[in-house]
């Protein structure tokens, strides 16, 4: 029996078999539904009228993992201009005309999908996305054609619930203060959405 066992001394190389341990890989449990709906709250800087609280809702449809479309509605109430504050009793707008409401439809692109790590073994799918859209803004008694450019960060807390941090610039032409100019109305929001 001893003569049948090959040895390195006899010129036969010994084969080393590595011990391979198969690792269990758990894929992120992202909901397979393509619709996403939710609400947001934040602040918007209405040009010439200061910053105000803004809130609204969004509905998105994900065509692929990278491309989506979303409809957004938001509302706020403009403050007073510096001219109104300095002049005292002058009111450029009525209370109803100070209501700032926008509707837009945008296309979004998940530019940097990835994961956010919390602790040693907790990872959540995330994505940095860009949006470009157009719509209408009702402000100062007029409807303004509006272009909206934005970016956001989506973090999937569960397979159906996500949080969003977003920034968006609503741009439209206005001649409210005597000269026609392109106004920039920058918005920062925090929101929650659900996939269904």
Question: Where would I find each of the regions flagged by the language model?
Answer:
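Repeated loop/turn-to-beta-strand initiation elements of outer-membrane beta-barrel proteins
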Residues: 35, 66-69, 114-117, 155-163
């Amino acid at each position: 029996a001893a003569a049948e066992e090959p040895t390195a001394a006899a010129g036969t190389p010994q084969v080393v078999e590595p011990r391979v341990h198969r690792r269990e890989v758990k894929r992120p449990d992202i909901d397979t539904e393509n619709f996403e709906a939710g609400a947001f709250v934040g602040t918007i800087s209405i040009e010439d009228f200061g910053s105000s609280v803004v809130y609204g809702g969004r509905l998105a449809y994900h065509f692929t993992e990278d491309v989506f479309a979303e409809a957004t509605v938001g509302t706020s109430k403009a403050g007073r201009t510096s001219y109104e504050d300095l002049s005292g009793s002058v009111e450029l707008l009525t209370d109803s005309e100070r209501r700032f409401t926008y509707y837009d439809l945008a296309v979004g692109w998940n530019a940097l999908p990835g994961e956010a790590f919390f602790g040693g073994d907790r990872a959540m799918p995330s994505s940095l996305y860009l949006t470009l859209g157009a719509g209408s803004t009702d402000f100062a008694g007029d409807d303004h054609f509006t272009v909206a450019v934005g970016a956001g960060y989506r973090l999937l807390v569960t397979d159906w619930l996500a949080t969003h941090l977003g920034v968006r610039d609503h741009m439209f032409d206005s001649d409210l203060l005597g000269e026609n100019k392109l106004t920039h109305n920058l918005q920062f929001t925090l929101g929650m959405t659900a996939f269904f």
